[in-house]
A protein has these predicted regions:
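Phosphate-coordination loops involved in phosphoryl transfer and adenosine-cofactor binding
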Residues: 13-15, 131, 193-196
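Glycine-rich beta-alpha-beta "Rossmann" dinucleotide-binding loop(s) and their flanking helix/strand
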Residues: 159-186, 279-324, 352, 356
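Rossmann-like dinucleotide/flavin-binding elements
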Residues: 19-38, 186-232, 304-306, 326-378, ...
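Rossmann-like nucleotide/phosphate-binding core characteristic of flavoprotein oxidoreductases
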Residues: 1-15, 23, 30-45, 54, ...
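Feature captures the FAD/FMN-dependent oxidoreductase FAD-binding
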Residues: 86-158, 163-166, 265-277, 293
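Glycine-rich active-site loop/strand segments that organize a redox cofactor
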Residues: 47-112, 223-241, 342-356, 396-399
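Glycine-rich dinucleotide-binding loop and its adjacent helix/turn
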Residues: 2-9, 109-112, 158-216, 220-222, ...
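A Rossmann-like FAD-binding core segment of flavoenzymes
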Residues: 215-315, 378-386, 390, 394-431
Length: 501
């Protein structure tokens, strides 16, 4: 007989299993529970919060939460200013991270982020089987899955992998890089005092290490083949964030830090440290560095275990699984992904900008959309959808464009979709992946989203499907990002006239 303190979800059969208790897994579990989808959550961790218990190494996140914002806290619109709390329709579960922030920065510390996630898990009553390591997976003849764990075998018809991009990754084609500590093995800053430090990689983890070592290192060099992509220039959260750009300013002002475009050709151990051989790319030429320490800030991959043996394909140097717009493996139906892994569903990538799915502010909405998709398609649940009168469509879409956090955080990736049918009427289909809307086809409908144009202007964009063809209509921007004005409503009404008349 089970005891009250026994861990939940003993080995057995469950309709759906979520692997992982980081923010992606917790968000998905909460969303599934709200819809009434029975599932189990398994994790190797001993507590929720995943990588935030260890990283970022220098404590502060690069995503902000603004305790004081021009909108009321615990509202949907406030999520626009709170990039770190999980999302819920329950006002008591909204905006939990700012509760734990001490006011010294609007970038939460990892401890503040951890406490926010723990509070969400506890207050939402999300049961998790901790200390249960995923060890392997089999696909059965009936299409179901057997998940081998340290606690025994589990069976399910739907499997969602939310283990994060947590596997340290290094490029295999650089001789000697196996001797180089990865970002996750970074020592305490004092260990780099008066040392020459070479950092392989110029993305956020590389700039984070460089920024943290500025008061300690004698000299810092960051290098990778391509120029650094900066968020303030690319208008993309996937680029190096301004939070860590002091080393870049040090470089451009000649302060002794160097940010170089160079391909690393070899790393050798020497009696006093390392010798790094490189070849300039933007400015061709051989380069050689004698340094005391080297750090490989070369990123992470997804620990997929044996999923590739089941047919799950990968890309990005095998670091991400390929996914449909609804985050499902194209080759293995029934295997889905949540959390930061969902950046493997690329979307339209307009103007070369990726989605916001690598971080909480983006993938929390992916998880909510995924929960509804799974409920409808895997469990045949008939979820209610709101009907609209014709004269309600323009005000409703204008309001969404003015402040729906899903559209602002997942620009050109998620969209509010409204379908128009002569028999069924006008229906709010909900938030959907924009790529799905554009590629799938169907009856008359509209998808409204926010996009940042090639010139960096943020503006509303509406995709109208009429007579089987999709037309893209760009509305005017606004210097104060107010897209609910009378002029925007007028433009919106004109765009929608063909399907609403």
């Amino acid at each position: 007989m089970a005891q009250l303190d026994d861990p939940p979800f003993p080995p057995g059969r469950y309709p759906l299993i979520v692997l992982g208790s980081g923010p992606g897994g917790i968000q998905l579990s909460h969303s599934l529970s709200r819809l009434g989808v029975d599932h189990a959550v398994l994790t190797a961790d001993e507590q929720p919060a995943g990588m935030f218990r260890r990283f970022p190494f220098f404590q502060r996140l690069i995503t902000w939460t603004k305790p004081y914002a021009p909108t009321e806290r615990r509202t949907r619109r406030y999520e626009w200013f709170d990039w770190n709390s999980l999302a819920s329709d329950d006002s008591g579960l909204k905006a939990l991270v700012p509760e734990f922030m001490d006011g010294t920065s609007y970038f939460p510390s990892r401890a503040e982020m951890q406490r926010g996630l723990e509070a969400f898990t506890e207050r939402a009553g999300i049961p998790v089987r901790y200390g249960c390591s995923w060890e392997g997976t089999r696909r059965e003849n009936d299409g179901s899955f057997t998940v081998g764990t340290s606690d025994g075998e589990y069976r399910c018809g739907t499997l969602v992998v939310a283990v994060g991009m947590t596997e340290p990754w290094k490029p295999a084609d650089i001789p000697g890089i196996d001797q180089v500590p990865h970002y996750v093995e970074t020592d305490a800053p004092e260990a780099y005092a008066d040392r020459r430090v070479f950092i392989i990689g110029k993305r956020n983890s590389g700039f984070e290490i460089a920024d943290g070592l500025l008061p300690w290192a004698r000299q810092i060099v960051l290098a990778s083949p391509r120029p650094a992509r900066l968020s303030i220039l690319t208008h993309s959260v996937a680029a190096a964030r301004a939070r860590y750009l002091q080393p870049y300013e040090d470089h451009v002002l000649g302060g002794g830090t160097f940010v170089l475009d160079a391909a690393i050709e070899r790393v050798e151990r020497t009696a006093s440290g390392f010798r790094v051989q490189a070849s300039g790319t933007t400015l061709p030429g051989a380069l050689e560095f004698e340094v005391d320490r080297v750090v490989a800030a070369t990123g992470f991959g997804t620990p997929l275990r044996d999923l590739p043996d089941l047919g799950v394909s990968t890309f990005h140097q095998d670091r991400l699984p390929a996914q449909t717009p609804f985050w499902e493996s194209p080759e293995v139906p029934g295997i889905f992904f949540a959390g930061s892994i969902t950046q493997g569903s690329i979307g339209l990538k307009k103007y070369g900008r990726p989605s916001g799915s690598a971080a909480v502010h983006g993938f929390r909405y992916n998880a909510r959309v995924l929960a509804e998709h799974v409920a409808r398609t895997r469990f045949e649940m008939d979820l209610p959808r709101r009907s609209l009168a014709a004269d309600e469509v323009v005000p409703y879409l204008a309001e969404e464009l003015a402040g729906a956090p899903e559209l602002w955080h997942q620009q050109a990736y998620l969209a509010r979709v409204i379908a128009v049918d002569r028999e069924r009427g006008i229906v709010d289909v909900g938030i959907l992946p924009l790529q799905h809307f554009v590629d799938r086809g169907g009856g008359d409908a509209v998808a409204a989203t926010i996009e940042t144009g090639e010139d960096g202007t943020i503006r509303p964009v509406v995709y109208v499907r009429h007579g089987g063809r999709v037309a893209e209509r760009v509305l005017d921007g606004d210097p104060l990002l107010d897209f609910g004005t009378a002029e925007h409503r007028k433009q919106l009404a004109a765009v929608l006239e063909p399907i609403l008349e």
